[in-house]
UniProtKB/Swiss-Prot annotation:
Protein's name in the database: DNA-directed RNA polymerase subunit Rpo5
Subunit relationships: Part of the RNA polymerase complex.
Protein EC: 2.7.7.6
GO cellular component: cytoplasm; DNA-directed RNA polymerase complex
Organism: Thermoplasma volcanium (strain ATCC 51530 / DSM 4299 / JCM 9571 / NBRC 15438 / GSS1)
Reaction catalysis annotation: RNA(n) + a ribonucleoside 5'-triphosphate = RNA(n+1) + diphosphate
Family as reported in the entry's similarity comment: Belongs to the archaeal Rpo5/eukaryotic RPB5 RNA polymerase subunit family.
First-level EC class: transferase
């Protein structure tokens, strides 16, 4: 059975790992602490696909999500990888 890469699906938005330097800039621009970002589970299929490319992604890593829209062009979202998604 062939492996399916969820990142190649047309309904899955672009996901990128944010560098620590870029993370500081983003959090400063947004005026928030990392703990206030929405969370994404390390078991999310997209995180697993990114790990296949980049290696293990640890808790606290910020992920940049770029969603395309026919009406808005695109919008950027950020999520932080967290084992405890619901507190």
């Amino acid at each position: 059975m062939a492996k399916f890469n969820v990142l190649d699906h047309n309904l899955v938005p672009e996901h990128h790992i944010v560098s620590e330097e870029e993370e500081k800039t983003i959090l400063k621009e947004l005026g928030i602490e990392k703990e206030f970002l929405p969370r994404i589970s390390p078991n999310d299929p997209v995180i697993k696909a990114l790990e296949a490319i980049h290696g293990k992604i640890k808790d606290g890593t910020v992920i940049k999500i770029i969603r395309n829209s026919p009406t808005m062009g695109h919008s950027v979202y950020y999520r932080v990888v967290a084992s405890e998604v619901f507190k």
